UniProtKB/Swiss-Prot annotation:
Any single biological process term in GO: tRNA wobble uridine modification
Keyword tRNA processing part of the UniProt annotation: yes
Descriptive protein name: tRNA U34 carboxymethyltransferase
Keywords, sorted A to Z: Transferase, tRNA processing
NCBIfam families membership: PRK15068.1 (NF011650), tRNA 5-methoxyuridine(34)/uridine 5-oxyacetic acid(34) synthase CmoB (TIGR00452)
Organism: Histophilus somni (strain 2336)
Lineage: Bacteria, Pseudomonadati, Pseudomonadota, Gammaproteobacteria, Pasteurellales
Gene of this entry: cmoB
Enzyme Commission number(s): 2.5.1.-
Length: 321
């Protein structure tokens, strides 16, 4: 089990201090509801060695190194422990000569998003649906004062804490295992990211409002989500599954998405990138035993999903509160 008290101490004297009114009780309730695998996964972090990196790079990668390389045996033991936390979805990580080659090349997405952002230097950042935290570390690498990720998935918390331990226990990033709908409106974050979340929401406008409620006035929203071609009235509502995913509800056109944001009261809304997801960005690796993008597409026509919908295309939208 993880101790969240260091995070409480961090935020006690910050603009997030109001969160202490609800968060400790919420996390106590969360711990009561965890399942058996969480206990097993959390113990794996205890088995990882306490290494001190001589060089950490979060600016161009998520990488830690020592001047003296690990022995083959040490490296294999770490790999063994980390593979107990499979599947690794978002990465990659380069830790002491170990390459965690995750399903997603999340560095590709970061390189698309980063040039358009308001500088993250000294900003308080929220990453909603952060997964195991790859992008959080890249945000720290850009100089963010503190990055808070929220994701209720127990495995992601354990993966994050494993990586943190191997990054000299860096406290500038913290993962809180809650959903955005469980957060009280803090209006405290300078930048809020929601990447790969909106299409999983039954009520997308509620999600956009929840994101807005976490931003300071004029703070920046970074929204990345699936889109389809079309006009302001075009919204794809899959009848059953989309790319084998059961929980996909609404995929708007870029114009429809901008309209949603306007209705929620955002301003300065702009689409800065639209990209079809490629097979080099999402694929099977030794760190993932499950199916990946190639299995979700029509084998005869990769412009369509296995169900016949348009293949995944993702837009990045920026807006201000």
């Amino acid at each position: 089990m993880f101790d969240f008290r260091p995070f409480y101490q961090q935020i006690a004297t910050s603009t997030l201090s109001a969160w202490l009114e609800t968060l400790p009780l919420q996390l106590k309730q969360w711990e009561k509801q965890t399942h058996g695998d969480y206990i097993k996964w959390s113990k794996i972090i205890d088995f990882l060695p306490h290494l001190t990196a001589d060089h950490i790079d979060l600016k161009s990668a998520v990488k830690a190194e020592t001047k003296t390389p690990l022995s083959s045996g040490e490296r294999q033991r770490i790999i063994h422990h980390l593979k107990q936390l499979m599947p690794w979805r978002k990465g990659p990580y380069h830790l002491y000569g170990i390459h965690i080659d995750c399903e997603w090349r999340s560095d590709f997405k970061w390189e698309r998003v980063l040039p358009h952002l308001a500088p993250l230097q000294n900003r308080l950042v929220l990453d909603v649906g952060c997964g195991s935290g790859y992008h959080m570390w890249r945000m720290v690498g850009e100089g963010a004062k503190m990055v808070v990720g929220i994701d209720p998935t127990e495995l992601f918390l354990c993966q994050f804490e494993a990586v943190r331990k191997l990054l000299n226990n860096d406290r500038r990033a913290n993962l809180i295992p809650l959903g955005i709908e469980e957060m009280q409106p803090l209006a405290a974050f300078d930048t809020v990211f929601s990447m790969g979340v909106l299409y999983h929401r039954k009520s997308p406008l509620d999600h956009l409002t929840q994101l807005k409620n976490q931003l300071v006035k004029d703070g920046e929203l970074v929204l990345e989500t699936l889109v389809v071609e079309g006009d302001i009235n075009t919204i794809l509502v899959p009848t059953d599954r989309y790319a084998k995913m059961k929980n996909v509800y609404f995929i708007p056109s870029v114009l429809a998405l901008i309209n949603w944001l306007e209705k929620c009261g955002f301003h300065n809304i702009r689409c800065v990138d639209v990209e079809t997801t490629g097979l080099e960005e999402q694929r099977k690796t030794d760190w993932l035993e499950n199916e990946s993008l190639i299995d979700f597409l029509n084998p005869q026509d990769h412009s369509k999903t296995i169900e016949g919908y348009p293949a995944p295309k993702r837009a990045v939208i920026l807006a201000n509160k």
